[in-house]
Regions:
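Signature of N6-adenine DNA methyltransferases within the class I
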Residues: 1-12, 16-19, 27-34, 38-168
Length: 168
């Protein structure tokens, strides 16, 4: 009924249609600054649900993606695929008011990846400003993705002056 009253207000979900400034491409290979340029004081919020692939389950192309983003980090071969988004996010928000948050595998917050990923993010002045405790996530898809995730929000520590939150 809304569609009848307000033309083009409600679109069918599928098939996907071009809308706004959605860019289709490999996020780890694209230049985020070119796609979404921002100034120091602009409020920009990146958020997403990047793919969850452990280091042992990545294809050769995905391993190359991680190397292109994290290749200067000692031990980058042990990183989950999603770690690339955290590193690119840290570069993107550096010295600005921009922030990012991702639904992520909980493995980047525990175990061997912590010593590889988080020191690099802290060197880039990134700091966790909110986090949700790990929880099981599934979906209704045919091949239901049963995974334990957490949600982590990050800001540049020089530009963030608010309270930090941990949600249980």
């Amino acid at each position: 009924r809304l569609e009848e009253e307000v033309h083009n207000a409600v679109r069918p979900t599928l098939p996907l249609q071009k809308a706004g400034a959605i860019v289709c491409g490999n996020s780890l290979r694209l230049d985020w600054e070119e796609i979404l340029p921002h100034g120091r004081d602009d409020e920009v919020y990146l958020f997403g649900n990047p793919p969850y692939l452990g280091a042992r389950k990545q294809s050769k192309d995905q391993k190359d993606d991680i190397k292109s983003v994290c290749g200067n980090m000692k031990g980058f071969n042990s990183l989950d695929y999603i770690a690339g988004w955290f590193v690119k996010g840290a570069r993107y928000i550096r010295s600005s008011n921009a922030r990012y948050a991702f639904v992520t595998t909980n493995s980047i917050n525990q175990g061997e990846q912590v010593s590889v990923l988080w020191p690099e993010l802290y060197r880039k002045n990134s700091d966790i400003v909110f986090a949700y405790q790990s929880f099981k996530w599934g979906n209704n898809a045919k091949n239901n993705a049963q995974v334990t995730v957490s949600i982590v929000g990050v800001a540049d520590e020089e530009y963030f002056s608010g309270d930090k939150f941990l949600f249980f």
